[in-house]
Design a protein with these regions (language model features):
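Beta/alpha (TIM)-barrel catalytic core signal, keyed to glycine-rich beta->alpha loops juxtaposed to Asp/Glu
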Residues: 4-127
Length: 128
């Protein structure tokens, strides 16, 4: 199981680790589950939520986040723990046409929706 989203894909060391893990799983016939694919950012110190991270809202950015994972046939997409997004996630998966989303559109999504890596070496990772 690993995180697979466009923000983490900007981190070369992480990408190399995931590529090695994917190849290992593929060689052994093991499915590689992905998590946090529709994550936008960590929630701040606010009221309780359905997940510990803020997911993308239903729409084109969420659809592209789903497509980003599904474009790699060796990966398995897990849905967010926020069940309210299940219909939008399933719809995006059903509409997936086999093509990876455009890298420029993913970059635009990261900017417009302020998508950031959930793991930044901070408090959650025990390094602060």
């Amino acid at each position: 199981m690993c995180i697979r989203d466009s923000a983490m894909a900007e981190q070369p060391d992480y990408v190399a680790d995931v590529d090695r893990l994917t190849a290992h799983c593929d060689a052994h016939g093991v499915a590689l589950q992905t998590i946090k694919s529709v994550a936008r950012c960590r929630w701040g110190d606010t009221d309780p939520h359905f997940s510990w991270y803020e997911p993308l809202a239903p729409g084109d950015a969420l659809r592209r986040a789903v497509e980003f994972v599904l474009a790699n046939p060796r990966l398995f997409l897990n849905t967010t723990s926020d069940a309210r997004l299940l219909p939008a996630t399933i719809d995006a998966a059903q509409r997936f046409d086999g093509r990876a989303p455009d890298a420029a559109m993913l970059a635009q999504d990261r900017t417009e929706h302020r998508i950031v890596s959930l793991f930044d070496g901070g408090l959650l990772e025990g390094t602060r």
